[in-house]
C-alpha cells in the first residue's frame, strides 16, 4: 500500500470507529418493565441482573476494547467470531453483554409468549421427538452445567436443532466452543439469574421459565437461521 492510501485508510478507520468519537457499547433498556416477568422472575432479580450485572459486563467490555485498538469498530458478533484472539476480558465481558441482550429479548410477560411456529415445532419434533421431550432435554442441559453458564438451543450448519451448554459467559457464536451454531434460545443458569427467588432450586427455575419464553421471537430467529 502506498503512503497516501495508507493515510486515507487510517483516516477512514478513525471516522468509522465508534471509539474514535467516544462512543462504545451500551446497555439497552429492558424490552418490558422490571416487574413484567413476575411471578416467574421477580422485580428485584431483574433490577439487579440487568442494572448491575449486565451493566458491569458492558462497562468492562468497553475498557477491554479501549485497551486493544485492533478491536475498535468491531461489532459484538464480530468479536464473538474471533474471540480466541481477543483475550479473556473481551471473552468474559463481551460474552456477558451478548448473552444477556439475547436473553432479555427471549422473554415476555407470562402467558404472552405464544407457541412455536409450525416450522419450528416440526423441527423440534424431528430432532427431539416432541416439545415436552425438548423441554426435558433443555432442562437437563441447564441442570448439568456445573457452576455458572448457559443452556442453548442452536441451529447447526446443516439446519438441525441441537441443545448445548457453555460455561461462564461463552456462547455458541464463539470460535472456541465445541458446538458452534446460531443460537435461537438461551437460558442463564448463573445463580444471580434466579437465586433471590429460587435459592438452590435451579430445576424449579428452569421449569417455571417456559412461562415467559417468547416463542414468537424464537420462531423468528429460527426462520432467520434457515435463510
Regions found by a protein language model. Give the residues of each.
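Feature for soluble, non-membrane regions of globular proteins
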Residues: 21-227
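Bacterial N-terminal signal peptides that target proteins for export
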Residues: 1-8
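Cleavable N-terminal signal peptides
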Residues: 9-10, 20
